[in-house]
């Protein structure tokens, strides 16, 4: 009897090859063309409030946002943009600013040339750039100004503000078809066409392909996946991914991660934003952290050292285990802005914080440095492993502080200016 063939993962398992797109330079950041997938974010301050906006852009940049979008919705906001750019430059923050325009972008960019110059990219929504006879004229004005100042644009269609004239046309054509599609499929087609037709018009006006980025955002995960698959199949423009109106808390994180994770695995996407509704008084930088963690978890980029920790169960002394895992995670994220320049390569560090002897020693050996805490009923001793080898055993009430000190020492010796080879990190017990 023949044995059935068993399908297994191989050492070549991974995402599909990246969809080949045209590289676009947004300030000093490359988007598309095989460049690393870029993390971006958006402020929620009143852009006219220069001080608050500068503070939030700075916080987002420190958290790791590589581009930051700001709303430019009225004259006071447009007038503030060059001052925001100036204040950021004085702080040494070179993160490109993207102007988000709706309805009157053509007028603001015309009337405030310093704003047009200070921004690194203009975001245009083809669904509300203008209405009826004014739409083409106002869209053309923005493209001509982008050409004048040498700025790229993102043409971003959105489910909630879709070009109704185009949608009505496609709905009528669908109704007359012998094999009509459902309304959602027609709406998805309108999204794709809105972006592609606008991009084609921009090129007719002299905008080169290497200054055009496209997006087509919806709030339903399956629709978003279908829209972006279609958009990628029909063009080679650089692509911005994002799930609009994802929501707050775990719902928003899960929805965005599910949608973007599938598309990224298929090789689609050159820059991403995780659009989260912040909790009242919440930290705006959470969206940056989630975007980084998504890319790092999937193996596309590394931003911070990875802390692996078991979920905990009845075998673990939960308080000690949880406190140490949280302490190490928070410490690493807080220190990363300084570590980036002081310890090149530290983002590749793997740390393991395990809760008991079942999987703890094995997982700790796979990390650069790991600890297996004593579980419930076990001896109060925690073996530490460095680069796969038993290093020493920590005991007593200061296990957490002692392990943190060992992590700091390991980072300094492994990634500091006088870095030693892994096996020379000092003195096992």
From Swiss-Prot:
HAMAP family: IspG. Gene3D superfamilies: Dihydropteroate synthase-like, Sulfite Reductase Hemoprotein, domain 1. InterPro entries: Dihydropteroate_synth-like_sf (IPR011005), IspG_bac (IPR016425), IspG_bac-typ (IPR004588), NO2/SO3_Rdtase_4Fe4S_sf (IPR045854). Binds 1 [4Fe-4S] cluster. NCBIfam families: ispG_gcpE, PRK00366.1. Pathway: Isoprenoid biosynthesis; isopentenyl diphosphate biosynthesis via DXP pathway; isopentenyl diphosphate from 1-deoxy-D-xylulose 5-phosphate: step 5/6. The keyword Nucleotidyltransferase does not apply. Its cofactor is [4Fe-4S] cluster. One of its GO terms (biological process) is terpenoid biosynthetic process. This is 4-hydroxy-3-methylbut-2-en-1-yl diphosphate synthase (flavodoxin). It catalyses: (2E)-4-hydroxy-3-methylbut-2-enyl diphosphate + oxidized [flavodoxin] + H2O + 2 H(+) = 2-C-methyl-D-erythritol 2,4-cyclic diphosphate + reduced [flavodoxin]. The gene is ispG. [4Fe-4S] cluster binds at residues 310, 313, 356, 363. It comes from Bradyrhizobium sp. (strain BTAi1 / ATCC BAA-1182). Belongs to the IspG family. Keywords: 4Fe-4S, Iron, Iron-sulfur, Isoprene biosynthesis, Metal-binding, Oxidoreductase. It comes from the Bacteria. GO terms for molecular function: 4 iron, 4 sulfur cluster binding; 4-hydroxy-3-methylbut-2-en-1-yl diphosphate synthase activity (ferredoxin); 4-hydroxy-3-methylbut-2-enyl-diphosphate synthase activity (flavodoxin); iron ion binding.
């Amino acid at each position: 009897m023949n044995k059935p063939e068993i399908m297994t993962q191989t050492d070549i398992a991974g995402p599909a090859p990246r969809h080949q797109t045209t590289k676009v330079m947004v300030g000093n950041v490359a988007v598309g063309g095989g460049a690393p997938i870029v993390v971006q974010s958006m402020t929620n301050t009143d852009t006219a409030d220069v001080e608050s906006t500068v503070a939030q852009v700075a916080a987002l940049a420190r958290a790791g946002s590589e581009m930051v979008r700001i709303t430019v919705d009225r004259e006071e906001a447009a007038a503030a943009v060059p001052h925001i750019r100036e204040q950021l430059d004085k702080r040494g923050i070179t993160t490109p600013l993207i102007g988000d325009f709706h309805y009157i972008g053509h007028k603001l960019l015309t009337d405030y040339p310093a704003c047009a110059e200070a921004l690194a990219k203009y975001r245009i929504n083809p669904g509300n750039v203008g209405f009826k006879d004014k739409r083409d004229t106002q869209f053309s004005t923005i493209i001509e100004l982008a050409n004048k100042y040498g700025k790229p644009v993102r043409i971003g269609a959105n489910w909630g503000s879709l070009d109704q004239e185009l949608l009505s046309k496609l709905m009528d054509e669908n109704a007359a078809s012998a094999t009509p599609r459902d309304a959602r499929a027609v709406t998805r087609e309108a999204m794709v066409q809105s972006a592609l037709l606008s991009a084609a018009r921009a090129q007719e006006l002299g905008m080169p392909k290497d200054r055009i980025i496209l997006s087509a955002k919806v709030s339903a995960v399956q629709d978003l996946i279908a829209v972006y698959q279609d958009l990628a199949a029909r063009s080679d423009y650089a692509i911005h991914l994002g799930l609009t109106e994802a929501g707050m808390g775990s719902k928003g994180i899960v929805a965005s991660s599910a949608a973007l994770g599938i598309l990224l695995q298929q090789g689609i996407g050159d820059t991403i934003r995780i659009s989260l509704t912040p909790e009242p008084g919440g930290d705006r930088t959470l969206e940056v952290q989630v975007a980084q963690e998504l890319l790092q978890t999937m193996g596309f980029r590394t931003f911070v050292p990875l802390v692996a920790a078991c979920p905990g169960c009845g075998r673990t002394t939960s308080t000690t285990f949880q406190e140490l895992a949280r302490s190490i995670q928070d410490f690493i994220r807080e220190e990363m802005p300084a570590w980036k320049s002081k310890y090149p390569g530290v983002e590749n560090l793997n740390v393991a914080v395990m809760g008991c002897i079942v999987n703890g020693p094995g997982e700790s050996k796979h990390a650069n440095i790991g600890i297996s805490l004593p579980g419930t009923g076990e001896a109060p001793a925690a073996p530490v492993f460095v680069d796969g080898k038993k290093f020493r055993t920590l005991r007593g009430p200061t296990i957490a502080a002692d392990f943190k000190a060992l992590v700091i020492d390991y980072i300094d010796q492994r990634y500091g200016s006088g870095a030693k080879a892994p096996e020379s990190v000092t003195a096992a017990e």
